[in-house]
Each structure stands twice: as C-alpha cells, then as structure tokens.
Amino acid sequence: MKQILMAGFITLTLSVNNALAQSRDDWPSPIPNEYFGQVLFDRLEYTRTDDQQNIGVWDMQAWYGGDYHRLVFKSEGENTQNDGMPTDLERAELLYGYLVSSFWSIQFGVGTKGELSSDADMENYAVVSYQGLAPYWFEMENSLRINEDGDMQFINETEYDWQLSQVSYLQPRLEVVANLTDSEKYDRQSGLSNIRIGLRYRHEIVREVAPYVGVYYSKALGNTADALKAEGKSTSETGVVLGARIWF
C-alpha cells in the first residue's frame, strides 16, 4: 500500500512540475519593458578667463529608451562674447547605446563639429564611446572619433562627485584629448594635445537644479603647444566659472 501511495505521489509531483514548466513559457515578464528619457545639462555656465574673455559654455546629453537599448544625443560647445566670431560647436552626436554591464554602456553613431556659420566647413565623423562608472564611482566617457578623411582623435572625460552633504558636492573634472593622426585640414597635430582640469562646488536647490561655482586650468601639450607658440599664441588658460547643472 505504501509503495502504491509513494508511486502515486511521485507521479503526481512529476506531472505538476511538468505542467508548471510548460506553462512558464506563457507567463508574462514580471517587469514589463518600459521606456524612459532624460535631458541633462551637466554644464551650463558662464566663464571668465585670465585674459578677460567672457565665454558661454554648454555640455548636455539626452537619451530615450529602456535599460539595455537607448537613443542618445550629445552636444557641447561655447561662444566667446563680443569677439565677432561664431559659436564653436565642439560636438553634436547622435548615438545608439547598449548596456554591456551593470555600470557600462557602449555607444556608436555619427557626429559633427565646427563653427556655426553659413560658410563654415563642418567636420563630420563616426564615433564610438564607452561610458559608465569606474571603480570608486568615477564617471568616465572614452570616445574615439574618425572623420571622413580618416583622421582619428581620442577624448577622455572623467568626473567624480565628492558628496559633502545631502545637497552639496565638490566635483573634480579631467579632460584629456589626444590626436592619433595629423590633420592639415583641421589644423591638428598628432600626439597628446590638451589637458583640462576643473573643480566645481555644486549645491542643489532641488534635485533637478544645482547652481555651481568653480575654476579650471587648460594646457596645450606636445606638437599642439609647439604650433601655438610658433603662432605667438598662449598655450594655457585659467578661468572661473558660474553655472548650473539642470536635468528633467
């Protein structure tokens, strides 16, 4: 009798497990796929340089998508006030981003840069970026650009938010530019080209709006510095900044 009951119990258990296994394929995902978006102006600032120039600067990023797949737009540039020159667009990029790990995404797409004027010769390029959080919560973006002439440029941007209180942060920032090839057309010399170090104190009024003040130092290096010296131009720049970090 016990053997019959045991055999029946085993048969029933196997039947239930088999039915559950077959039905799992029809179960909906416990978390549905949802799509979100964000627009972030990481730097929206007014700069006063050591040679008395007033410069407006923006650095923004917008994205839309899910956890793994996103459409990303990045734009960065500056305008020197009252110098008679057009706005300098440092980049405008449209990218596809894919999350490759918990903290890193790879992005690739196309971009353009140059002076925003009707007769400007814009530089168009393909770009691959690796962006995310490094150990100890350093925010990093590594980008490789290849323009239509085959000229290559590598750019690294690193930031760290040192939290002083619930609403106050001290943010060191480093940007390094390296030209992997010469470019006569765009007046670039190969080698390590420029390094820029900044420090900003940021205070959140609300989470979405955080005014800041800061300082920076920029230095041309290598062949780029030699070319500037030959033209009688300065190879370094220091400035103070006043701006806000805004997102929505």
Set out the residue ranges of the language-model regions.
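Outer-membrane beta-barrel initiation region
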Residues: 19-82, 98
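Hydrophobic, lipid-facing positions within transmembrane beta-strands of outer-membrane proteins
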Residues: 37, 56-60, 90-94, 124-128, ...
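Transmembrane beta-barrel strands of outer-membrane/channel proteins
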Residues: 43, 73-77, 108-112, 142-146, ...
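Solvent-exposed loop/turn segments connecting transmembrane beta-strands
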Residues: 47-55, 78-90, 112-124, 144-155, ...
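Residue-level signature of outer-membrane beta-barrel architecture
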Residues: 64-66, 98, 132, 146, ...
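Repeated loop/turn-to-beta-strand initiation elements of outer-membrane beta-barrel proteins
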Residues: 67-73, 102-108, 136-140, 165-170, ...
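Detector for outer-membrane/organellar transmembrane beta-barrel domains
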Residues: 119-183
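Outer-membrane beta-barrel "beta-signal"
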Residues: 201-204, 234-248
